[in-house]
């Protein structure tokens, strides 16, 4: 097929046309200024590295997500020796506690997230195993797999 690109002062248009003369048009706004340095938010080093089964984690996060609400939408992940405890507690909804086996050796530590922000990248991955790296409860964490993929996720403060 063919692609026709039209650029004006404040937008760009991409017209996609195939052999059957059917097509699609994508229009985007152009913004002024320099592209932000996204590498600044990607942690270069991490204190903790955890390896987990993607499907098992995904199902556990979905179950924990049921026990959250708009006001209290966090799931706490507590990592200990080869064990992950996922907890969510919403007074008007209920409480969830689930454990799963992981590959981790280190001190016990916890971090909390909006579960949907963890579920979204897991849904996009085909790998069976993921690596989660983080430094502390308030710094960004990184989801990695054994290929060029990186997903930065911000934790939530919990009381």
Regions found by a protein language model. Name each.
Residues 1-29, 46-159:
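DNA polymerase processivity clamps
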Residues 32:
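Flexible glycine-rich active-site/ligand-binding loops centered on an Asp-His dyad
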Residues 41-44:
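Short hinge/gating elements
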């Amino acid at each position: 097929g063919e692609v026709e690109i039209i650029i004006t002062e404040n937008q760009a248009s991409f017209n996609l046309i195939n052999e059957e003369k059917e097509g699609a048009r994508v229009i985007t706004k152009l913004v002024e200024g320099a592209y932000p340095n996204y590498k600044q938010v990607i942690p270069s080093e991490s204190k903790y590295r955890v390896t987990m089964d993607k499907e098992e984690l995904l199902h556990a996060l979905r179950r924990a997500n049921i026990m959250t609400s708009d006001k209290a939408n966090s799931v706490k992940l507590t990592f200990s020796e080869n064990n992950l405890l996922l907890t969510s507690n919403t007074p008007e909804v209920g409480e969830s506690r689930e454990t799963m086996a992981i590959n981790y050796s280190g001190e016990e530590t916890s971090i909390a997230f909006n579960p949907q922000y963890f579920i979204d990248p897991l849904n996009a991955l085909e790998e069976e195993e993921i690596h989660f790296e983080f430094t502390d409860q308030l710094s960004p964490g990184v989801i990695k797999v054994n290929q060029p993929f990186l997903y930065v996720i911000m934790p939530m403060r919990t009381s």
